[in-house]
From Swiss-Prot:
InterPro entries: Aldolase_TIM, DapA, DapA-like, Schiff_base-form_aldolases_AS. Pyruvate binds at residues 45, 210. GO terms for molecular function: 4-hydroxy-tetrahydrodipicolinate synthase activity. This is 4-hydroxy-tetrahydrodipicolinate synthase. The keyword Hydrolase does not apply.
């Protein structure tokens, strides 16, 4: 996986709650121009759970087309890590095959939610999906969402036994897990899935981030990651500290509720629309977001 900084993209909706494809393309181009290595369409932040199968595939397609046709400032191409998560292995497998067919660089696959599979079930789920494609696969551990964690031995077994499982997105909140994974397998790439822990995970052996805050501040997230990769940890920490209040504000309610409203307040999307069961943030949250964006001089 030849990327380090990336954003878990929001999926903008029109007022009628259809996907705003033009706005989506614009958001991806902004990521490209502000230095991100990759984008991650239709993950948790992209509200994949409320997209139809057709919409899910179309969002992946737009991301790939936009990255293919838009050069980065260094005249390269931004990579696409396509979200293919589902609580049905067959559906994830179908999405994985589609993503590979149309040119995704890699796929991100979350553990099945609601089903609460055993560790053997998780192993078979990921193994089945990975063996259906040739492109790299990133595991996604977020037990607060899925109800079950990919335990360290299971993650290591997947990495060791399935050749194209190359990385894991760590959103467990446990630095102990990160340390263990890196200790036992230095080549198992670890990406931070917790903005508040980006610097700490990079310092503990991580090689990149998949950021929610990056939707709003891609340039700063990219700078932080690049500093950490160059072992300029003090500079990376300064950027992490600079983003602290923003990271906090963007998670006062369930993601992606705050980030979509923040993007709207910043003038980056026209409609802060959500599909049920997600609803608009509270008045108090909107006020906090406005105050925070003023603090960062994003809005006047």
């Amino acid at each position: 996986m030849q990327f380090h900084s990336s954003s878990a993209l929001i999926t903008p909706f029109k007022k009628d709650l259809s996907v705003d494809e033009a706005a989506y393309e614009t958001l991806i181009k902004r990521q490209i121009f502000q230095g991100m290595d990759a984008c991650v369409p239709v993950g948790t932040t992209g509200e994949s759970a409320t997209l139809t199968h057709k919409e899910h595939m179309r969002c992946i397609e737009i991301a790939i087309e936009t990255c293919k046709n838009t050069k980065t400032p260094s005249n390269s191409r931004m990579k696409v890590l396509a979200g293919v998560g589902s609580n049905a292995t067959s559906e994830s497998l179908s999405l994985a095959k589609f993503a590979q067919k149309i040119g995704a660089d890699a796929i991100l696959c979350v553990s099945p939610y609601y089903n609460r599979p055993t560790q053997q079930g998780l192993f078979e789920h990921y193994k089945t999906i990975a063996q259906s494609v040739e492109i790299p696969v990133m595991l996604y551990d977020v037990p607060s969402r899925t109800g079950v964690s990919i335990e360290v031995p299971t993650a290591l077994k997947l990495f060791r036994e399935v050749p194209n499982i190359k990385a894991i997105k760590e959103a467990s909140g446990s630095l102990k897990r990160v340390t263990e994974l890196h200790y036992y397998e230095k080549d198992f790439k670890i990406f931070s899935g917790e903005d508040s822990l980006n610097h700490s995970i990079m310092f503990s052996g991580g090689c990149g981030v998949i950021s929610v805050t990056g939707n709003l501040m891609p340039n700063l997230i990219s700078q932080m990651v690049n500093c950490a990769l160059k072992q300029k940890y003090q500079q990376a920490l300064e950027i992490q500290n600079k983003l602290f209040c923003l990271h906090q504000a963007l998670f006062v309610e369930t993601n992606p509720i705050p980030i979509k409203m923040a993007m709207h307040l910043a003038g980056l999307i026209e409609n802060p629309s959500y599909r049920l069961p997600l609803v608009a943030p509270s008045k108090e949250t909107i006020q906090l977001l406005e105050k925070t964006l003023q603090q960062y001089e994003v809005i006047a």
